[in-house]
């Protein structure tokens, strides 16, 4: 298989190339048995049962093969937001279907080859998320996406407070910028250092978006005095790191086979920090365990927030359930079907 060149802009890193086949050869020998989560998820059977209706609706607007990739979306939302009411659970499920559909659209090679169309779709996604009014005739190629999305974000805006709705839109914009960054590091562009990867992937993991939706799911709104507390901000950053590590571990095999290098495990290996993919997996699992310990310690050390303390505790609970729900879903999802050796995988 043809070698792919990866260039480094950092003075300590020399130009190098990597052989995708060499990475593929290591995949069957990887051991993930030491990969577990300290955080548990709940499960809302009512939300899970809504999946069929949500996907049937999506199938009216998108190709069958794209909708098929959304299998077990109900399971994801049911685990991450298990305390949501039926009404809010249905909205959350639709938002996740939208997010996965648009993410897959942005990943299509034919779209990436046409930079103008790629940017146009990104702008449209933001307009839809913000529930903005705009001349829909300017986007004839995305008419189905617009028709599908309008009811979702209209209902979300009606149910959410104005502050929470705008915070969601802001975090979604940050997420899309992360997606843009991910696209920029494909060969032959430079592969970033680990710290850059870590900070950007806090947005790219979707954790910050999910944490706003966690408030929505529990019908709370966390006051700025709580969210702005340094300890709470660090807690949210570490929780995003954890979600990012989980996504990287579970998606590793799929990303190697797809030629995607935006993965902490691959960054460690390609930078020469570890000598094998297994060593890189072990390093990320260790980083993950360390992050879990930091989160647990931080939760125990957070101060009381006076009259806002009950909301703060509910927020912490909602976020840890998001983490646990994401882990459990990733371990079972057919979306990562090539990663059959991962713990608890159905395949």
UniProtKB/Swiss-Prot annotation:
Question: Which chain positions carry the site (Plays a critical role in the stabilization of intermediate cation)?
Answer: 100
Which keywords does this chain's UniProt record carry? Lyase, Magnesium, Metal-binding
Where does this protein hold Mg(2+) 3?
Answer: 247, 251, 255
Residue ranges of the motif WxxxxxRY motif: 329-336
Q: Where does Mg(2+) 1 bind?
A: 103
The protein's GO terms of the molecular function aspect are:
metal ion binding; terpene synthase activity
Stretches of the chain forming a coiled coil according to its record: none
- Superkingdom as given in the UniProt entry: Eukaryota
Cite the Gene3D superfamilies for this sequence: Farnesyl Diphosphate Synthase
Q: Name one Pfam family in it.
A: Terpene_syn_C_2
Q: Which cofactor does it need?
A: Mg(2+)
Listed InterPro entries: Isoprenoid_synthase_dom_sf, Terpene_cyclase-like_2
Q: List the ranges annotated as motif D(D/E)XX(D/E) motif.
A: 103-107
Which residue numbers does the motif NSE motif cover? Answer: 247-255
The UniProt transmembrane annotation reads none
Detail which positions bind Mg(2+) 2. 103
Q: What class of enzyme is it?
A: lyase
Task: Name the PANTHER family for this protein.
Answer: BETA-PINACENE SYNTHASE-RELATED, TERPENE SYNTHASE
Q: Which family does it belong to?
A: Belongs to the terpene synthase family.
Q: What is this protein called?
A: Terpene synthase 2
Q: Which organism is it from?
A: Physarum polycephalum (Slime mold)
